[in-house]
Amino acid sequence: TLANGLRAMDEVIEFLDYGSGDRFGHGLALGLNVDAYFKKKRYTIVSNVEEYFDDIVWMYHFIRAHIDRLEVKDFISGLSYTEYDILSMLEREFDRVKGYYNFDKLYTLYDFYEAYKLRGDDPEVYLEYNDGWNYDKVKFCCQTRINWHNPEHQSAANNPKARELYIKYHYCDKYKANHFKTFTGEASSIFIDAVKLVQFILRLKIYRMEIGIEGNPTSNRKISFINKYIDLPLLELNS
Protein backbone atom coordinates (compact mmCIF):
# COMPACT_ATOMS: atom_id res chain seq x y z
CA THR A 1 0.00 0.00 0.00
CA LEU A 2 1.02 3.63 -0.36
CA ALA A 3 1.03 4.16 3.41
CA ASN A 4 3.27 1.12 3.76
CA GLY A 5 5.74 2.53 1.24
CA LEU A 6 5.91 5.84 3.09
CA ARG A 7 6.40 4.06 6.42
CA ALA A 8 9.21 1.96 4.95
CA MET A 9 11.07 5.12 3.94
CA ASP A 10 10.72 6.57 7.43
CA GLU A 11 11.99 3.29 8.88
CA VAL A 12 15.14 3.59 6.77
CA ILE A 13 15.73 7.07 8.19
CA GLU A 14 15.10 6.06 11.80
CA PHE A 15 16.58 2.56 11.92
CA LEU A 16 19.50 2.98 9.51
CA ASP A 17 20.57 6.44 10.69
CA TYR A 18 20.04 8.24 7.40
CA GLY A 19 21.26 11.81 7.32
CA SER A 20 22.43 14.65 5.11
CA GLY A 21 23.93 13.39 1.85
CA ASP A 22 22.30 9.95 1.97
CA ARG A 23 19.99 8.94 -0.87
CA PHE A 24 16.82 7.00 -1.56
CA GLY A 25 16.40 5.06 -4.78
CA HIS A 26 13.22 5.98 -6.68
CA GLY A 27 11.17 7.12 -3.66
CA LEU A 28 7.98 6.76 -5.69
CA ALA A 29 5.70 6.89 -2.66
CA LEU A 30 6.81 10.45 -1.95
CA GLY A 31 5.63 11.83 -5.26
CA LEU A 32 2.61 9.74 -6.21
CA ASN A 33 -0.67 11.59 -6.59
CA VAL A 34 -2.61 10.13 -3.67
CA ASP A 35 -6.06 10.66 -5.20
CA ALA A 36 -5.00 9.06 -8.49
CA TYR A 37 -3.40 6.16 -6.64
CA PHE A 38 -6.53 5.25 -4.69
CA LYS A 39 -8.74 5.76 -7.74
CA LYS A 40 -6.53 3.27 -9.59
CA LYS A 41 -6.93 0.87 -6.65
CA ARG A 42 -10.72 1.38 -6.75
CA TYR A 43 -10.59 2.89 -3.28
CA THR A 44 -9.69 -0.47 -1.78
CA ILE A 45 -6.92 -1.25 0.70
CA VAL A 46 -5.43 -4.73 0.35
CA SER A 47 -2.71 -5.72 2.80
CA ASN A 48 -2.07 -8.19 5.57
CA VAL A 49 -3.33 -7.46 9.06
CA GLU A 50 0.11 -6.90 10.57
CA GLU A 51 1.29 -4.42 7.94
CA TYR A 52 -1.97 -2.46 7.97
CA PHE A 53 -1.94 -2.31 11.76
CA ASP A 54 1.66 -1.03 11.71
CA ASP A 55 0.63 1.60 9.16
CA ILE A 56 -2.14 2.89 11.44
CA VAL A 57 0.15 3.03 14.50
CA TRP A 58 2.91 4.79 12.55
CA MET A 59 0.60 7.28 10.81
CA TYR A 60 -1.00 8.31 14.10
CA HIS A 61 2.26 9.05 15.88
CA PHE A 62 3.99 10.47 12.81
CA ILE A 63 1.23 13.06 12.49
CA ARG A 64 1.22 13.77 16.24
CA ALA A 65 4.98 14.35 16.21
CA HIS A 66 4.80 17.03 13.49
CA ILE A 67 1.35 18.54 13.97
CA ASP A 68 2.63 21.82 15.42
CA ARG A 69 4.80 22.75 12.42
CA LEU A 70 3.47 25.78 10.56
CA GLU A 71 3.92 24.09 7.18
CA VAL A 72 1.91 21.11 8.37
CA LYS A 73 -0.91 23.26 9.73
CA ASP A 74 -1.00 25.15 6.45
CA PHE A 75 -1.20 21.87 4.50
CA ILE A 76 -4.02 20.56 6.72
CA SER A 77 -6.02 23.72 6.01
CA GLY A 78 -6.26 22.56 2.39
CA LEU A 79 -7.61 19.10 3.28
CA SER A 80 -11.25 18.13 3.71
CA TYR A 81 -10.70 17.03 7.32
CA THR A 82 -9.05 18.56 10.37
CA GLU A 83 -6.15 17.02 12.26
CA TYR A 84 -8.60 16.11 15.04
CA ASP A 85 -10.81 14.25 12.56
CA ILE A 86 -7.85 12.36 11.11
CA LEU A 87 -6.32 11.40 14.46
CA SER A 88 -9.70 10.30 15.81
CA MET A 89 -10.24 8.11 12.75
CA LEU A 90 -6.84 6.48 13.24
CA GLU A 91 -7.61 5.84 16.92
CA ARG A 92 -10.88 4.14 16.00
CA GLU A 93 -9.16 2.08 13.32
CA PHE A 94 -6.49 1.04 15.83
CA ASP A 95 -9.14 -0.17 18.28
CA ARG A 96 -10.92 -2.07 15.52
CA VAL A 97 -7.91 -3.84 14.03
CA LYS A 98 -6.37 -4.59 17.44
CA GLY A 99 -9.16 -7.12 17.87
CA TYR A 100 -7.37 -9.40 15.42
CA TYR A 101 -4.62 -9.92 18.00
CA ASN A 102 -6.93 -10.93 20.85
CA PHE A 103 -4.31 -10.33 23.54
CA ASP A 104 -5.12 -11.14 27.16
CA LYS A 105 -3.51 -7.89 28.32
CA LEU A 106 -4.38 -4.26 27.60
CA TYR A 107 -1.91 -2.58 25.25
CA THR A 108 -2.40 1.03 24.21
CA LEU A 109 -1.69 2.69 20.89
CA TYR A 110 1.36 4.23 22.57
CA ASP A 111 2.62 0.81 23.73
CA PHE A 112 2.44 -0.50 20.18
CA TYR A 113 4.28 2.54 18.87
CA GLU A 114 7.03 2.18 21.46
CA ALA A 115 7.38 -1.49 20.48
CA TYR A 116 7.55 -0.38 16.85
CA LYS A 117 10.49 1.90 17.72
CA LEU A 118 12.45 -1.17 18.86
CA ARG A 119 12.28 -2.76 15.41
CA GLY A 120 15.91 -1.93 14.68
CA ASP A 121 17.11 -3.99 17.67
CA ASP A 122 18.26 -7.58 18.00
CA PRO A 123 15.23 -9.25 19.64
CA GLU A 124 17.48 -11.69 21.52
CA VAL A 125 18.56 -8.76 23.72
CA TYR A 126 15.06 -8.55 25.16
CA LEU A 127 15.03 -12.24 26.00
CA GLU A 128 18.46 -12.15 27.61
CA TYR A 129 18.03 -9.00 29.72
CA ASN A 130 14.28 -8.68 30.32
CA ASP A 131 14.49 -9.85 33.95
CA GLY A 132 15.86 -7.01 36.08
CA TRP A 133 15.92 -4.66 33.10
CA ASN A 134 18.56 -1.92 33.31
CA TYR A 135 18.90 0.28 30.24
CA ASP A 136 22.40 1.56 30.98
CA LYS A 137 23.68 -1.98 31.49
CA VAL A 138 22.07 -3.19 28.25
CA LYS A 139 23.42 -0.21 26.35
CA PHE A 140 26.93 -0.94 27.64
CA CYS A 141 26.78 -4.67 26.88
CA CYS A 142 24.88 -4.52 23.59
CA GLN A 143 25.97 -1.34 21.82
CA THR A 144 26.01 -3.01 18.41
CA ARG A 145 22.72 -4.84 18.93
CA ILE A 146 20.35 -1.99 19.80
CA ASN A 147 19.52 1.32 18.18
CA TRP A 148 20.55 3.26 21.31
CA HIS A 149 21.65 6.41 19.46
CA ASN A 150 18.07 7.09 18.33
CA PRO A 151 16.76 9.79 20.73
CA GLU A 152 13.45 7.94 21.18
CA HIS A 153 14.99 4.56 21.88
CA GLN A 154 15.48 4.72 25.65
CA SER A 155 11.86 5.58 26.45
CA ALA A 156 10.70 2.71 24.23
CA ALA A 157 13.12 0.17 25.70
CA ASN A 158 12.18 1.18 29.24
CA ASN A 159 8.48 0.51 28.56
CA PRO A 160 7.87 -3.08 29.78
CA LYS A 161 4.76 -3.47 27.61
CA ALA A 162 6.71 -2.33 24.56
CA ARG A 163 9.36 -4.95 25.30
CA GLU A 164 6.65 -7.59 25.68
CA LEU A 165 5.12 -6.64 22.34
CA TYR A 166 8.49 -6.65 20.62
CA ILE A 167 9.15 -10.17 21.89
CA LYS A 168 5.68 -11.22 20.70
CA TYR A 169 6.38 -9.65 17.30
CA HIS A 170 9.28 -12.04 16.79
CA TYR A 171 8.36 -15.13 18.80
CA CYS A 172 4.59 -15.32 19.35
CA ASP A 173 2.84 -17.55 16.79
CA LYS A 174 -0.51 -15.83 17.41
CA TYR A 175 1.05 -12.44 16.69
CA LYS A 176 2.96 -13.60 13.62
CA ALA A 177 -0.11 -15.33 12.21
CA ASN A 178 -1.55 -11.91 11.41
CA HIS A 179 1.18 -11.46 8.83
CA PHE A 180 -0.57 -14.14 6.77
CA LYS A 181 -4.13 -12.88 7.25
CA THR A 182 -5.39 -10.76 4.38
CA PHE A 183 -6.85 -7.39 5.26
CA THR A 184 -9.25 -5.72 2.84
CA GLY A 185 -10.87 -2.39 3.60
CA GLU A 186 -12.28 0.76 2.08
CA ALA A 187 -10.00 3.71 1.42
CA SER A 188 -12.41 6.31 2.77
CA SER A 189 -12.01 10.00 2.01
CA ILE A 190 -10.66 10.67 5.50
CA PHE A 191 -8.13 7.83 5.21
CA ILE A 192 -6.98 9.29 1.88
CA ASP A 193 -6.50 12.67 3.58
CA ALA A 194 -4.45 10.92 6.28
CA VAL A 195 -2.16 9.42 3.63
CA LYS A 196 -1.81 12.81 1.93
CA LEU A 197 -0.80 14.29 5.27
CA VAL A 198 1.87 11.72 6.13
CA GLN A 199 3.23 11.96 2.59
CA PHE A 200 3.60 15.73 2.96
CA ILE A 201 5.20 15.44 6.40
CA LEU A 202 7.68 12.83 5.17
CA ARG A 203 8.61 14.97 2.17
CA LEU A 204 9.20 17.88 4.52
CA LYS A 205 11.29 15.72 6.86
CA ILE A 206 13.47 14.41 4.01
CA TYR A 207 13.91 17.92 2.60
CA ARG A 208 14.98 19.31 5.98
CA MET A 209 17.39 16.44 6.54
CA GLU A 210 18.94 17.06 3.09
CA ILE A 211 18.43 13.47 1.97
CA GLY A 212 18.53 12.97 -1.79
CA ILE A 213 16.10 11.10 -4.04
CA GLU A 214 17.53 9.24 -7.02
CA GLY A 215 15.20 8.94 -9.98
CA ASN A 216 15.36 7.34 -13.39
CA PRO A 217 12.37 8.24 -15.59
CA THR A 218 12.28 5.00 -17.57
CA SER A 219 12.54 2.65 -14.58
CA ASN A 220 10.23 4.86 -12.50
CA ARG A 221 7.57 4.47 -15.17
CA LYS A 222 8.03 0.71 -15.38
CA ILE A 223 7.75 0.03 -11.65
CA SER A 224 4.79 2.34 -11.01
CA PHE A 225 1.23 2.49 -12.33
CA ILE A 226 2.04 5.70 -14.26
CA ASN A 227 1.58 5.56 -18.04
CA LYS A 228 2.82 9.01 -19.04
CA TYR A 229 6.20 10.52 -18.25
CA ILE A 230 4.54 13.84 -17.47
CA ASP A 231 2.82 12.13 -14.50
CA LEU A 232 6.01 10.72 -12.97
CA PRO A 233 6.25 11.12 -9.17
CA LEU A 234 9.76 12.53 -9.59
CA LEU A 235 8.34 15.66 -11.24
CA GLU A 236 6.01 16.22 -8.32
CA LEU A 237 8.99 16.31 -5.95
CA ASN A 238 10.42 19.22 -7.93
CA SER A 239 7.21 21.25 -7.85
Go through the PLM ranges and name each one.
Residues 187-191, 195, 218-219:
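Active-site-proximal segments of catalytic enzyme domains
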